[in-house]
Curated annotation (Swiss-Prot):
It is found in: Cytoplasm. Its EC number is 2.7.4.6. Its main location: cytoplasm. The keyword Cytoplasm applies. Its cofactor is Mg(2+). It catalyses: a 2'-deoxyribonucleoside 5'-diphosphate + ATP = a 2'-deoxyribonucleoside 5'-triphosphate + ADP; a ribonucleoside 5'-diphosphate + ATP = a ribonucleoside 5'-triphosphate + ADP. The keyword Lipoprotein does not apply. This is Nucleoside diphosphate kinase. Major role in the synthesis of nucleoside triphosphates other than ATP. The ATP gamma phosphate is transferred to the NDP beta phosphate via a ping-pong mechanism, using a phosphorylated active-site intermediate. InterPro entries: NDK-like_dom, NDK-like_dom_sf, Nucleoside_diP_kinase, Nucleoside_diP_kinase_AS.
Length: 137
């Protein structure tokens, strides 16, 4: 089924200048970039986006990391896009990620793990709406 999902290339990957390599992974695996923007998240935006994690012990560090530099936010479209994106990203902890996944190849740690991807179709809809207006597609 053709779906859309959200992907965020995080500050650590921008600092390493691997944005193009990550986008190539998506495109060469059947995911089309249908919307994209580069921005610097405010603390408020990061807190609102990651509100589901507000009570978790890592929340403060996550917010500090996500506002530490610019990010690239994208909408990816393709067959089973949510699952495909998660497969391409690999495990949250790059040490556990399979060789050839984005996190295994480009991430430093469980915190600086290069990319974010929606974990469900419902969350994909909400996350896309957080960053993009319908007219941007």
């Amino acid at each position: 089924m053709k779906q859309r999902t959200l992907s965020i290339i995080k500050p650590d990957a921008l600092k390493k200048k691997v944005v193009g390599k990550i986008i190539d992974r998506f495109e060469s695996n059947g995911l089309e970039v249908v919307a994209m923007k580069r921005l610097h998240l405010s603390v408020k935006d990061a807190e609102n986006f990651y509100a589901i994690h507000r009570e978790r012990p890592f929340f403060k560090d996550l917010i500090e990391f996500m506002v530490s530099g610019p990010v690239v936010v994208m909408v990816l479209e393709g067959k089973d896009a949510v699952a495909k994106n998660r497969e391409l990203m690999g495990a949250t902890d790059p040490k556990l990620a399979q060789k050839g996944t984005i996190r295994a190849d480009f991430a430093e740690s469980i915190d600086a793990n290069a990319v974010h991807g929606s974990d469900s179709l419902e969350n994909a809809h909400n996350e896309i709406a957080f960053f993009f207006a319908a007219r941007e597609f």
